[in-house]
């Protein structure tokens, strides 16, 4: 049907032959951009297709995908704004006088403007890069005609159609936030809308227990907003439970309230407020903003994957692909969050896209190693991790076959202001309980956790033992040294709190 609607007087063969490429990439997020740019560097003629379906509240954005526009970048900038505000409160302890704590107020509009100016600058940088690399960019929606032919519909008012073909097609369309199937769900927003709100969110209910929900709760609370998080199951599934406990307990000290054992039944508009009715004995409460952060769904609805023979997981809807990123039909590939059983991390998508292009256009055999990938949750006290959690290690090796070294510590920058956050800072190493003492996982809760874990992730990747850690001379004083100072095991029952400073 689509073929017949486009210039019927032109032969189909001519339409396709005039728009042939070596590679078509659908989706200009982190994975799609990485794959496109690498392929172009290797001499491929590349078509990159990307369009953003506006949110139910009308917000859309430029090239770069979730991370650059409504994910990692704006989120981390707002996290940094929260850190700056906290440091101001401790400045007088370090001799910085004249800061009137009563006059310190946060201006949401200033932050939002500056954050989104940075986002738009990134959009422009991406467009310049595509132009420099002679990548053919189409601001359009894509749909498969068959596995190597794509019909695109432009975002212009005429919705201009065109046809493209290539022997290699990469799908990298990512995920979008999920709206619940309840009355009034449309009255809520998602993280796709949060960073461009015209005014401060006010009293906010965040529904979800994953990293998006908790990170948003953290920085909004720091901006003096009344924040409640509804956690329907366990928070931060897949992360080490000891670490999650300290993150959650600390989050509560910042003023974030945590609702458990209830769900949202419906949302109603009451003037400018949102009246939320909870299940069971949860009652009814009014909020200024409701944020849905309980899961994400594949951004695939317009692609018509059946025409290409691309199989998806029946439960998640994600694309099934092998370790070489090959989908279920020859010539179609998938990278990034859209792939089943892959961690939803920007750096993984970038690496996957790059190595896929290498395999397609430079005879490379290298594939991504999905084990031992480090990640960070940017809650007020950050949580970083690489490798197995204690729970995963027990499940895989047995409780008697692993050893857990751990410590509570006080970050040096917390000493002078006597920052009470130190009571939640924690470090853990999980290793085998044999002569090798091979490190299975490293976990850190504290300030600058991402900066701490990155170097250890390199060491973890090449394989290190507990003795390697303990025989490493520390940099002192810093939080990172807590890993190399570890010596108390959980099994011993000794007090894991660090004592003293330089001895």
From Swiss-Prot:
Cofactor note: Binds 1 FAD per subunit.
GO biological process terms, semicolon-separated: cell redox homeostasis
Organism: Caenorhabditis elegans
Keyword Nucleus: no
UniProt cofactor(s): FAD
Catalytic activity field: 2 glutathione + NADP(+) = glutathione disulfide + NADPH + H(+)
Enzyme class: oxidoreductase
Protein name: Probable glutathione reductase 2
């Amino acid at each position: 049907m689509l073929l017949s609607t486009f210039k019927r007087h032109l032969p189909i063969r001519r339409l396709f032959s005039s728009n042939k490429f070596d590679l078509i990439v659908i989706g200009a997020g982190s994975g799609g951009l990485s794959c496109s740019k690498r392929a172009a560097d290797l001499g491929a003629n590349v078509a990159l297709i990307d369009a953003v379906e506006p949110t139910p509240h009308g917000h859309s954005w430029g090239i770069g995908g979730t991370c650059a526009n409504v994910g990692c970048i704006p989120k981390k900038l707002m996290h940094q704004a929260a850190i700056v505000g906290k440091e101001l409160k401790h400045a007088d302890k370090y001799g910085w006088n004249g800061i009137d704590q009563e006059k310190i107020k946060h201006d949401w509009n200033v932050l939002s403007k500056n954050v989104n100016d940075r986002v738009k600058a990134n959009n422009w940088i991406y467009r310049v890069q595509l132009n420099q690399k002679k990548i053919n960019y189409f601001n359009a929606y894509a749909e498969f005609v068959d596995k190597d032919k794509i019909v695109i519909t432009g975002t212009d008012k005429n919705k201009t159609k065109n046809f493209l073909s290539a022997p290699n097609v990469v799908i990298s369309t990512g995920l979008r936030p999920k709206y619940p199937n309840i009355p009034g769900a449309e009255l809520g927003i998602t993280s796709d809308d949060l960073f461009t709100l015209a005014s401060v969110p006010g009293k906010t209910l965040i529904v979800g227990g994953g990293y998006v929900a908790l990170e948003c709760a953290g920085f909004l609370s720091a901006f003096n907003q009344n924040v409640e998080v509804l956690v329907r199951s366990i928070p931060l599934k897949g992360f080490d439970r000891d670490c999650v406990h300290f993150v959650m307990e600390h989050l509560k000290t910042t003023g974030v309230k945590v609702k458990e054992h209830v769900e949202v039944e419906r949302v109603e508009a009451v003037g400018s407020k949102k009246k939320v009715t909870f299940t069971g004995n949860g009652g009814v409460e009014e909020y200024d903003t409701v944020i849905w952060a309980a899961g994400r769904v594949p951004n695939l609805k317009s692609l018509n994957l059946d025409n290409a023979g691309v199989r998806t997981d029946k439960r998640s809807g994600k694309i099934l692909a092998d370790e070489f990123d090959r989908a279920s039909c020859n010539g179609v590939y998938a990278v990034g969050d859209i792939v089943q059983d892959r961690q939803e991390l920007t750096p993984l998508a970038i690496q996957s896209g790059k190595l896929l292009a290498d395999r397609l256009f430079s005879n490379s055999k290298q594939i991504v190693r999905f084990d031992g990938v480090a990640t960070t949750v940017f809650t007020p006290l950050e949580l970083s991790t690489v490798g197995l959690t204690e729970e995963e290690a027990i499940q895989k090796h047995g409780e008697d076959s692993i050893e857990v070294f751990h410590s509570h510590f006080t970050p040096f920058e917390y000493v002078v202001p006597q920052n009470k956050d130190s009571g939640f800072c924690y470090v853990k190493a999980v290793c085998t309980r044999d002569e090798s003492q091979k490190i299975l996982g490293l976990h850190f809760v504290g300030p600058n956790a991402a900066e701490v874990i990155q170097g250890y992730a390199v060491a973890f990747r090449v394989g290190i033992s507990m003795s390697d850690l303990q025989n490493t001379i520390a940099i002192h004083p810093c939080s990172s040294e807590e890993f190399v100072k570890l010596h108390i095991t959980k099994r011993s029952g000794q007090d894991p709190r660090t004592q003293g400073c330089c001895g």
